[in-house]
Amino acid sequence: PQPWWIEGEGFLHLFTKYTGVRELYWSRSPDGRQWSADRKLAGIEGHYQTSRQRGSRVVTAFNRHPEGYPDRRTDLYYLETTDLGESWQTADGAPIEPPLVEPHNAALVREFDAEGRLVYMKDIDLDAEGNPVILVVTSGDHRSGPAGAPRIWTIARWDGTSWRFGEVTRSTHNYDMGSLYIESADHWRIIAPTEPGPQHWGTGGEMALWVSDDGGDSWRLEREITRNSAFNHTYARRPVNAHPDFYAFWADGDPFEFSPSRLYFTNREGNAVWRLPEVMESVLEEPILEE
């Protein structure tokens, strides 16, 4: 579920229905209590999506699952709405009449299936000009281990006329999950577990901060946020309207066996990590600054 509050209008809720396959739907509400009927956005055999809201505009990007198998997830699509789902359009403004049911349609950003690449959705944001920027990891295999390499953190950016693509870095697992932060026209950040962790071929790794000073054209590793960890870290999520001192939130754990799993957060600079208490002794507890 991905609910978005549109000031003065209400909620637009983007979500998945498991109808035998994973299909995308939306509904809307003026107050979060009374909801419209569910309406299907896409049913091309199955999808996963990531979305974002700015003002009255809600943007979403998603892959497709050939024959309903998420292990074969591929291709990349984009749609947006400015009226709580009353109408939908592509990045170039072409109107779309949902639901999407055919793989080849105007919302298709790139046909990764033809390249033999799988697509794992990570995040979406809007640049300083309001153009969508999508973050994905592409892979050669759904299984963990070296067979899927290279696993490429990829930026797909609409430049006003066409989609442009660029590589950020490479990863060790398809489910390495991070977030994109577009702070100005030139300055972009990614916080993600891109560095190998103690469980090398497992989900996650060591958390890192990547920075671009040229609007996503090139990237550099600014800082390793975690080091020498006992367990892999992953699923760094960007809080809505993130405060500079609470810029990314994630968990750790051993992906191969049962283990403790703790919650962490970092600041905008990625130069400190706090761990939440595993046991709350009172209503309020201080987070623990990691050494």
Predicted regions and their residues:
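Extracellular, repeat-based ectodomains that mediate carbohydrate processing or recognition
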Residues: 1-291
